[in-house]
C-alpha cells in the first residue's frame, strides 16, 4: 500500500506540480487513498443499501435527523462567517487571488476550507438517511454525482490550491447549506412542514451560486494572477456540469408539478361542466337547483 501511495504521489506531482506544504500532516490530506476508499464505500452503499432495505420497514430517524441537520447548519454558518471575515481581513481581490499573498489570512482560509472538505465526508450521511428511510427516489444521478465528486475534488484543492481564488464557491455553498440544512432539519418535524415554503427557492439559489462561481472564476482567467489557470478551467467545467444536472432536476421537479396541477384543475373544471350538462339532460328536479317551477296556465 505504501508503494502504491508513493507511486500515486509521484504521478500527482508530475501532473499537478508540488503540493502546498502548509497542509502537510493534516488529517486525511497526506495521501489520497483514504478519500478514495471512503468514496468507493459510499458508492457501494448507494448500490447495496436499497437492496438490503427492500423487504424491511423504513426507519424514522426523526430525532437523529434534527440533530444532524442542526449540526450541519451550524457548521455551514461557521464556515460562511469565517470565510467572509478571512477574505475581508486578507483584502482578497475578487477578480483573481493567488494562494500566497495574504499571510495569516491565507492560513485562516486554509483552516476553514479543511472543514469544508471534511464536511463533504459528513454529508455522505444525506444519502444513508435516504436509504434508511426508503426515500430511494431522492437518490438521483445528480445527488450521487454531487456528493461523490465534491469530496474528491476538495482533496485535490486542499493539497494544491487551499486558499486564494478557491474561497468563492465554498463561501456561496456554505451560505446555501445554511438555508438547505435548516430546511431539512425543520422538515423532520411534521408539525413544521406546512410552514416550509422555500424549498423551490433553495434549488434556485443553488443554480445562482453556480452561475456566480463561473463568473468569478472567469475573472481569474480574463485577469490572471499567480493562481494556476488549469484549476480555474476545471472549476468552470465542473460548474457547467452541475448547472446542467440541477436545471434538469428543477424542470423535472417543479415545472412538471406545475403542469400536473394545471392539468388536474382543467380536468376538475371539465368535470364540473359535464355535471351541469348531465343535471339538465337527466331531468333533475328544478327544486334541487333552487329554481321555483312556474305555474302552468289553465286555459
Swiss-Prot record:
Biased composition regions of type Polar residues, renumbered to the chain: 279-288
E.C. number(s) listed in UniProt: 2.3.1.199
Record's keyword terms, sorted: Acetylation, Cell projection, Disease variant, Endoplasmic reticulum, Fatty acid biosynthesis, Fatty acid metabolism, Lipid biosynthesis, Lipid metabolism, Membrane, Neurodegeneration, Phosphoprotein, Spinocerebellar ataxia, Transferase, Transmembrane, Transmembrane helix
GO biological process, one term: fatty acid elongation, polyunsaturated fatty acid
Pathway, per record: Lipid metabolism; polyunsaturated fatty acid biosynthesis
GO MF terms, alphabetically ordered: fatty acid elongase activity
Record's function text: Catalyzes the first and rate-limiting reaction of the four reactions that constitute the long-chain fatty acids elongation cycle. This endoplasmic reticulum-bound enzymatic process allows the addition of 2 carbons to the chain of long- and very long-chain fatty acids (VLCFAs) per cycle. Condensing enzyme that acts specifically toward polyunsaturated acyl-CoA with the higher activity toward C18:3(n-6) acyl-CoA.
Coiled-coil features, chain-numbered ranges: none
Family: Belongs to the ELO family. ELOVL5 subfamily.
GO cellular component terms listed in the entry, alphabetical order: dendrite; dendritic tree; endoplasmic reticulum; endoplasmic reticulum membrane; membrane; neuronal cell body
Organism in which the protein naturally occurs: Homo sapiens (Human)
Classification via Pfam families: ELO
Chain positions with N-acetylmethionine modification: 1
Region (Disordered): 274-299
Subunit description: Interacts with TECR.
Enzyme category, top tier: transferase
Official protein name in the record: Very long chain fatty acid elongase 5
Tissue: Ubiquitous. Highly expressed in the adrenal gland and testis. Weakly expressed in prostate, lung and brain. Expressed in the cerebellum.
Sites bearing Phosphoserine, chain numbering: 285
Compartment annotation: Endoplasmic reticulum membrane; Cell projection, Dendrite
Bilayer topology: Multi-pass membrane protein
Transmembrane segments: 26-46, 64-84, 112-132, 139-158, 168-187, 205-225, 226-246
Pathology linked to this chain's protein: Spinocerebellar ataxia 38: A form of spinocerebellar ataxia, a clinically and genetically heterogeneous group of cerebellar disorders. Patients show progressive incoordination of gait and often poor coordination of hands, speech and eye movements, due to degeneration of the cerebellum with variable involvement of the brainstem and spinal cord. SCA38 is an autosomal dominant form characterized by adult-onset of slowly progressive gait ataxia accompanied by nystagmus. Brain MRI shows cerebellar atrophy.
Amino acid at each position: 500500500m505504501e508503494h502504491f501511495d508513493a507511486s500515486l504521489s509521484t504521478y500527482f506531482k508530475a501532473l499537478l506540480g508540488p503540493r502546498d506544504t502548509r497542509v502537510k500532516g493534516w488529517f486525511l490530506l497526506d495521501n489520497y487513498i483514504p478519500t478514495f476508499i471512503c468514496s468507493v464505500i459510499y458508492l457501494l452503499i448507494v448500490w447495496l443499501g436499497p437492496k438490503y432495505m427492500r423487504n424491511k420497514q423504513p426507519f424514522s430517524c426523526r430525532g437523529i435527523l434534527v440533530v444532524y441537520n442542526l449540526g450541519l447548519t451550524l457548521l455551514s454558518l461557521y464556515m460562511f462567517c469565517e470565510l467572509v471575515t478571512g477574505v475581508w481581513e486578507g483584502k482578497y481581490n475578487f477578480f483573481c487571488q493567488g494562494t500566497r499573498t495574504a499571510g495569516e489570512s491565507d492560513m485562516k482560509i486554509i483552516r476553514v476550507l479543511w472543514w469544508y472538505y471534511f464536511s463533504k465526508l459528513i454529508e455522505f450521511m444525506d444519502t444513508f438517511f435516504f436509504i434508511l428511510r426508503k426515500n430511494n427516489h431522492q437518490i438521483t444521478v445528480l445527488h450521487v454525482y454531487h456528493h461523490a465528486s465534491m469530496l474528491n475534488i476538495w482533496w485535490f484543492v486542499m493539497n494544491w490550491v487551499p486558499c486564494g481564488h478557491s474561497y468563492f464557491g465554498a463561501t456561496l455553498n456554505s451560505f446555501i447549506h445554511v438555508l438547505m440544512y435548516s430546511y431539512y432539519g425543520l422538515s423532520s418535524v411534521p408539525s413544521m412542514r406546512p410552514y416550509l415554503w422555500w424549498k423551490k427557492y433553495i434549488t434556485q439559489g443553488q443554480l445562482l451560486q453556480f452561475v456566480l462561481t463561473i463568473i468569478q472564476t472567469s475573472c481569474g482567467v480574463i485577469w490572471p494572477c499567480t493562481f494556476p489557470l488549469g484549476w480555474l478551467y476545471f472549476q468552470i467545467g465542473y460548474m457547467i456540469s452541475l448547472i446542467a444536472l440541477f436545471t434538469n432536476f428543477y424542470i423535472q421537479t417543479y415545472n412538471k408539478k406545475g403542469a400536473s396541477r394545471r392539468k388536474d384543475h382543467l380536468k376538475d373544471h371539465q368535470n364540473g361542466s359535464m355535471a351541469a350538462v348531465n343535471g339538465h339532460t337527466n331531468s333533475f328536479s328544478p327544486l334541487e337547483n333552487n329554481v321555483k317551477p312556474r305555474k302552468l296556465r289553465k286555459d
